[in-house]
Amino acid sequence: MKPTADMIIIGGGIHGASLAFHLAQRGVKVLLLEKSYLAAGATGRSSGLVRMHYDLELESRLAWESFQYFRDWRERVGGDCGFRRTGFIYIAPPEQTEALKANIQMHQRI
């Protein structure tokens, strides 16, 4: 019998590799095609920042989920992905104070 796949994914960057991983976890037979090597394109040249501060609640919720995934990588996937929790500082002009306070309240709800 010829080998088959339920899903063929073209591109082994972060999106393609993540999709392949999650589909395979759900029992889907996946074939991932990459013309060079995994993370050869923009993914491999990325600074790898997992940003947490967004203006929209949906984006902030997605960022929180992503953060937890990278933080718990070893337990979820196995091995070390190189994630290191660091910090971030934003020096805002005074006219942004109220907007930033509202943003902080939104983040605290998440």
Segments from the language model and where they lie:
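Accessory recognition modules or surfaces
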Residues: 2-4, 41-45, 50
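Anionic group-transfer/hydrolysis microenvironments
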Residues: 8, 36, 53
